[in-house]
Amino acid sequence: MNKINKYLLTGIVSLSMTACANLDLNPLSEGSSENWYHDETEIEMALNDLWRPDFFPIDAIYWDDDLLNRNGSNEVTLGTVTSQWGTSSTRWSSLYKSIARATKVLDNGSATGISESKVNQYKGEAYFMLGFAYCELTAYYGDCVLNKGMTLDEAYVATRSPKNEVLAYAFECLDKAAEYLP
């Protein structure tokens, strides 16, 4: 019995000493923000993703009573829209996704071997998206969180910035877009 306990203890200790090296590795076989932006193709793919329809919200026609009859009711016509409303939360998160992706392109969008005119075009598209997204956020929500490169720790405690400050930054981004785009 003592011999079995020794083998059992040795086996448990052996198994407990094995572990994975680092479980926080990005999948090396797939693209991620850590291993992307090496060449022109990857940067263009990242920019093309900024033009997905989710990032350009269109208001529904049934939100207005000018075209449809006034007998129907919905959250907008009743004035009961809250942050829990599906459209509201989806737009908020989609616009911030586009901001994060545009910022990532600005931070990493100048890989070696790309002409200056192409880099400027990439910067222009990313700045346009930043400006557009912040304009949309202020149109829908007024004050919103302004991310000018905050760290993750800062993001956890970030508060909304005044609408006029966000719009000033959005217009600054749109001016840069006009400067960089051909």
Task: Cite the ranges covered by each PLM segment.
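Short linear capping/connector segments at secondary-structure termini
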Residues: 29-32, 80-83, 148-155
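Conserved, well-structured interaction surfaces
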Residues: 44, 75-141, 155-168, 172-182
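Short, small-residue-rich loop/turn micro-motifs
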Residues: 144, 148-150, 174
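Proline-centered turn/helix-capping motifs that create local helix->coil transitions or kinks
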Residues: 21, 58-61, 137-146
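Bacterial Sec-dependent N-terminal signal peptides
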Residues: 1-29
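Short, compositionally biased low-complexity segments
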Residues: 18-27, 73-75, 142-145
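Membrane-proximal, proline-rich intrinsically disordered regions
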Residues: 20-63
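Short alpha-helical hairpin
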Residues: 61-81
